[in-house]
Amino acid sequence: MQKVNDYMINSMQFLYLVASYLFGNILTAYIVTKWRHNVDIRDEGSGNPGARNMGRVYGKGYFVATFLGDAIKGAIVVSIAKYLFEDFTFVMLTLLAVIMGHIYPMLFKGKGGKGISTFIGGLIAFDYLIALTLVAVFIIFYLIFKGFTKPGLITIACLPLCMILYSYSIVTTILSALIIVLILYVNHE
């Protein structure tokens, strides 16, 4: 049985969590629309600075660019954490931090994206086998529901089960469940 001290974080980890949150504040949609059109995407379409709104307002190319930018952001945070700290529980905590930074960015007064792209990129970097398993789950639900939103949210909700199936610790699994609750909450609003 692990001791409570095993889950304490040191000052370097704390600084990395803060940096992860701040890195999450970089909103690809905002940067792209400011650069290309000199507008704030939060004033366009649904007002959400995410890939889906970019696709609706500016087309598929903007959707792809925004998705990739936000996904890479999550992947960078998780990849560096895996390299530096080698603790899956802490790495999952960094994924939560970057997603929190994306959804509730301090730089944008708490009005960010919905976190799905950042989550996907971070999850692929965390464990590509879990990501592939969830892709298979998504395909099954996509064939049943013939849409993206419902199958996507159902698939995301399956993450904690995958964490258990792939033998991650209970604490890491609980952190993954917190991420899912956050994403489902934000996407329900």
Curated annotation (Swiss-Prot):
GO BP annotations listed: phospholipid biosynthetic process
Pathway where this protein functions: Lipid metabolism; phospholipid metabolism
This protein's GO CC annotations: plasma membrane
Molecular-function GO terms, alphabetical: acyl-phosphate glycerol-3-phosphate acyltransferase activity
Keywords: Cell membrane, Lipid biosynthesis, Lipid metabolism, Membrane, Phospholipid biosynthesis, Phospholipid metabolism, Transferase, Transmembrane, Transmembrane helix
Subcellular location(s) per record: Cell membrane
Topology relative to the membrane: Multi-pass membrane protein
UniProt function note: Catalyzes the transfer of an acyl group from acyl-phosphate (acyl-PO(4)) to glycerol-3-phosphate (G3P) to form lysophosphatidic acid (LPA). This enzyme utilizes acyl-phosphate as fatty acyl donor, but not acyl-CoA or acyl-ACP.
UniProt subunit comment: Probably interacts with PlsX.
Name of protein: Glycerol-3-phosphate acyltransferase 1
Gene coding for it: plsY1
